[in-house]
């Protein structure tokens, strides 16, 4: 059931209760979690926070905690499966779900008592009507008219029996037709996976309704939305619309005419709307390295080729940027160059086919020195979340990533930024390697690439977010590099080694690369059907259905089934 009043139907209900907060490991979920934690602290709500890596862990953790809690809040998990069927909770358990995953399971939508959806209904949900998918009429086993006291003449009784049989046959035919139509409706509804409004934005909306929103909460909402943009999960139109919504809040919280004392305080926090460059981490790197390791510039200039490197030199010369300036840290660049950088870069980018080199975004300044773009925070947090440098537990990474979102933990954020640079370098090197060695193969209805065991940085890509980023960057770069028009329109399936000892791979599928794409992904259902038809040993454990784990020896039969399914 959808919650129409976030305050009355959600917050006011749990404010005096103990709550179990189950949070998925993604940046938007962490931002939503920070906002909710801040609201809980305001009203002294008792809660326990538990990170949840996938469906299996959700079931295990629920079993562990179900006796101690009645109220459960799930962030970015739980909406797209039948939650009550999966968890088998007691009747008094109540689940509040704030999740961007679509489509929402129909049982969750139409359950009025135990499942409460903290999800915006104006998202393009296309929910099937209740009567089309649920049949409340119980089919009578026997027709009541069948019962006879034997007093009627046998001829009349026979005619009565025939009429009852015909009615029963007609009812069964209608039932079969209804069930066939229901299967069709459910298939159409569940066919594509996509994402709705950021959970961090939903939690900020709650804070705003309660008049408890702060600049910190607003910044977390901005980072949550930017995470969706960085990961290409929402359409450009949806992103621009949501940026507009947040921009109004930014104006409200960050007045230009604030008193001088506050605006120059060492503890101050100022958020500003920016029309900034699509260059990852450029303010914390050198401009040269950022251009080389940002997906947009690297793919458009084809930097994996000698011709691309030559084009890069021409591009920098056209900008009038001395190589010495471009290759040193951004902070050390000549001030006059820094001030005019956006305009200079945009003018030259247009000549080199990069017409969308600037994007609507936000920046934050903490005190005098620390300035960050929203995308900087996204890369830092996701790199901390999926850190493979030390063999730490996922929970440790989760806590560090969550801490890095607080402005009192800037040291952790800077650590995340350094790790983000390493991730971006690893992605670009892997993209260059895959394109130069022709590892991307056309399998008919889709492109396929497998990262071999022993590939540099392959361990990084055993994590879902990093693998998805690589997949998106790889497809964009391949589309820019190939001359085959048909291949430009194909989706991509990417697989990487997961656990050598267990002999498993992790696989992700993404829709075709197109600016106008609706970002709807059909691989989730396709993976399920391919696994079913071949009895492949797969694990559908990720909250994103288009990511699966698979036994290495089942890979070829699974792919064959996927090809025939999508052909």
Curated annotation (Swiss-Prot):
Domain of life: Eukaryota
Biased composition, class Acidic residues, residue ranges: 133-150
Keywords on record: Cell cycle, Chromosome, DNA replication, Nucleus
Cellular compartments per GO CC: CMG complex; DNA replication preinitiation complex; nucleoplasm
GO annotation terms (biological process): DNA replication initiation; double-strand break repair via break-induced replication; mitotic DNA replication preinitiation complex assembly
Chief place of localization: nucleus
Keyword GTP-binding: no
Subcellular location: Nucleus; Chromosome
One Pfam family from the record: CDC45
GO molecular function, one term: single-stranded DNA binding
Stretch list, region Disordered: 133-160
Keyword Glycosyltransferase attached: no
Function of the molecule: Required for initiation of chromosomal DNA replication. Binds to chromatin in a mutually dependent manner with the GINS DNA replication complex.
Assembly description: Interacts with topbp1. Component of the CMG helicase complex, composed of the mcm2-7 complex, the GINS complex and cdc45.
Family the UniProt entry places it in: Belongs to the CDC45 family.
Name of the featured protein: Cell division control protein 45 homolog
Species this chain originates from: Xenopus laevis
């Amino acid at each position: 059931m959808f919650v129409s009043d976030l305050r009355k139907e959600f917050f006011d209900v749990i404010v005096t209760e103990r709550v179990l907060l189950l949070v998925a490991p993604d940046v938007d979920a962490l931002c939503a979690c920070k906002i909710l934690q801040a609201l809980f602290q305001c009203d002294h709500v008792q809660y326990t926070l538990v990170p949840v890596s996938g469906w299996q862990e959700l079931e295990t953790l629920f079993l562990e905690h179900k006796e101690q809690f009645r109220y459960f809040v799930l962030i970015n998990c739980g909406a797209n499966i039948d939650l009550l069927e999966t968890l088998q909770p007691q009747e008094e358990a109540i689940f509040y779900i704030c999740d961007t995953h679509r489509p929402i399971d129909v049982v969750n939508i139409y359950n009025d008592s135990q499942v409460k959806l903290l999800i915006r209904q104006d998202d393009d949900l296309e929910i099937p009507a209740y009567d089309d998918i649920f049949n409340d009429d119980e089919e009578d086993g026997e027709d009541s008219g069948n019962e006879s006291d034997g007093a009627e003449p046998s001829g009349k009784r026979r005619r009565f029996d025939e009429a009852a049989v015909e009615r029963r046959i007609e009812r069964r035919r209608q039932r079969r037709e209804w069930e066939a139509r229901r299967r069709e409706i459910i298939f159409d509804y569940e066919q594509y996976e996509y994402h709705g409004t950021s959970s961090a934005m939903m939690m900020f909306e709650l804070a705003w309704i309660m008049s408890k929103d702060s600049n910190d909460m607003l910044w977390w909402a901005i980072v949550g939305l930017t995470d969706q943009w960085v990961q290409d999960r929402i359409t450009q139109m949806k992103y621009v619309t949501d940026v507009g919504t947040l921009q109004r809040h930014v104006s409200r919280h960050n007045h230009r005419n604030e008193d001088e004392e506050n605006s120059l305080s060492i503890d101050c926090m100022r958020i500003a709307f920016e029309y900034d460059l699509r260059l990852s981490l450029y303010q914390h790197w050198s401009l040269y390295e950022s251009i080389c390791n940002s997906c947009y510039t690297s793919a458009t200039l084809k930097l994996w080729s000698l011709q691309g490197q030559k084009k890069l030199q021409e591009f920098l010369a056209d900008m009038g940027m001395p190589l010495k300036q471009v290759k040193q840290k951004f902070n050390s660049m000549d001030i006059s160059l820094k001030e005019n950088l956006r305009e200079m870069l945009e003018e030259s980018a247009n000549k080199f086919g990069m017409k969308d080199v600037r994007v609507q975004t936000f920046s934050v300044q903490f005190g005098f020195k620390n300035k960050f773009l929203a995308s900087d925070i996204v890369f830092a947090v996701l790199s901390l979340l999926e850190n493979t440098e030390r063999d730490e537990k996922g929970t440790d990474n989760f806590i560090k990533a969550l801490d890095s979102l607080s402005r009192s933990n800037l040291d952790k954020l800077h650590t995340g930024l350094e790790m983000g640079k390493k991730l971006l370098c690893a992605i670009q090197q892997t993209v260059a390697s895959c394109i130069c060695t022709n590892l991307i193969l056309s399998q008919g209805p889709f492109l396929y690439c497998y990262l071999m065991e022993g590939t540099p940085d392959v361990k990084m890509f055993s994590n879902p977010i990093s693998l998805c980023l690589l997949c998106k960057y790889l497809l964009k770069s391949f589309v820019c590099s190939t001359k085959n028009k048909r291949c430009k329109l194909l989706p991509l399936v990417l697989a990487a080694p997961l656990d050598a000892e267990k002999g498993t791979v992790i696989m992700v599928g993404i829709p075709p690369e197109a600016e106008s794409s609706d970002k709807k992904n059909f691989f989730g259902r396709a993976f399920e059907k391919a696994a079913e038809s071949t009895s492949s040993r797969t694990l559908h454990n990720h909250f994103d259905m288009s990511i699966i784990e698979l036994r290495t020896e089942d890979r070829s039969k699974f792919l064959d089934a996927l090809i025939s399914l999508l052909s």
